Amino acid sequence: FDGQIRALKETFGMQEGEVDMTTLPIFALFNPALGITTVMPEINPSTPAKASARSLVETLLDFEVTTTFASPVIGRKIANWCEQRNLRLPVMKRFFLAGAPSPPALIEKLASFMDNGNVFVPYGATEALPVSYCSHTEVADTREGIERGEGSCLGQPLPGVSVKLFPVSSSPFGKEIQEVKDGEVGEICVAGPTVTEEYYRMPGATFDSKFLYESKTYHRMGDLGYFDAKRTLRFLGRKVERLNTPQGFLETERCEAIVNSVHGVRRSALIGLGTKDPVEPCVIIEPEQEFRTPKAINVIEQEVLSRLSVRLPGFKITQTRIESSLPVDPRHNAKIHRLALAKKWSER
C-alpha cells in the first residue's frame, strides 16, 4: 500500500487538496492517505454499464473533479456525453482508463475534452498495481500499429518496478527459468514495491504465481506480451485465452484490435470453436446499436474478414458470429468472458 501511495504521488503527481470521482469504491481507500477528497457519483458499482452519462459528467463538473479511475465503459459514456453536449472538462488533470484494453479511438476522444490533463492507461492487477502506464499521446503514436495487431501499448514500467518476460507455461516456474529473447512473446512477470509477496494463507496459489529470480520475488500476471523496438511493453491478451489454431498460436489482442477498428463494431472477441486443440478461430462481433440491420451486419462481417486476411495472412479466419451484447465481468463491465462464449458457440 505504501508503494502504491508513493507511485501515485511521484509518478502521477497526485496532491493534497485534489478531488477524485470514484467509480470503484476500493480505489477510494487511497484518497485519505493522499489528502484527496472522494466524490461518489450516482452509480451502482456492480453495474457500471448502467450508469447515467449525464450524472457522471455533472459530477465531474459540479465538484470540479481533478482525477478519476474508470473502466472503458464509463469512459465511453463520458466521452459521448461531452461530444453530444459540446462540453469540456477544464479542471481534469488525469483520467485513468483501466479494467480492460481501451480502444485507441476512445482514449484520444476522451483526451480531446481535457484542456489541461492527460488520459492515462495504467497496467496492473489486484496483486500488482500499478506496473506500467502510457499516456494518450503514446497511444496516439502507436495507434496504427495497435490496429494492425501489434498489441495494446502498456508503456514503460514505473521506477523501481521490474518487468520480465518468460516462456509461456501452465506449470510453476523453477530455478532453471530463463527470459525470452528480445522481441519474443512471453508471460509478463513483475517485481517491485507495488507487487504483493504472497497470497494470505494460500500457499498453493503463492507457489503457482510467485517465484524467485535474481533474488527478487516475481508475480506471474497471466498475461502475454513483448517489448517492442523502443522497449515499450505491449499487451497481447490473457494466457488462458490464447488459441492453438492449425496455423499456430494466436493471441486475442493481435486479432480483436483489427476487428474493433472496423466502422460499426463496438467490440469483439476472438474465440476457438471446438473442444480439442487445434481449434478453429472465430470472431464474435458486437455491432454498434445503429449498425444492427442485416445489411449493415453483412457489410461489417465482410470488412472484418477482409482486414484479417490482409493483416493476419498466416492465419485462416473465416468464421464470424454476431452477439447483441458480449458477456463481461461484474467489476468493470469490460473484461469479456471469451471462454464462456467459446463454450456457447462450440456446443451449437
Map each language-model feature to its residues.
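Conserved AMP-binding/adenylation subdomain of ANL enzymes
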Residues: D2-V19, L24-T66, W81
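Gly/Ser/Thr-rich phosphate-binding loop
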Residues: K9, D20-M21, I36, T67-F69, ...
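Hydrophobic C-terminal alpha-helix "anchor/cap" residues
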Residues: L110, G225, I258-N260, L308-S309
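Short Gly/Pro-enriched turn/cap motifs at secondary-structure boundaries
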Residues: E150-P157, E179, S215-K216
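Conserved ATP-binding/catalytic segment of the ANL
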Residues: P172, Q178-P246
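C-terminal boundary motif of the adenylate-forming
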Residues: K175-E176, G222-L224, S261-E288, K316-Q319
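Adenylate-forming
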Residues: V195, S209-K210, T232-N260, I284-K295, ...
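Conserved C-terminal "lid"/linker of ANL adenylate-forming enzymes
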Residues: A269-G274, C282-V283, L305-R348
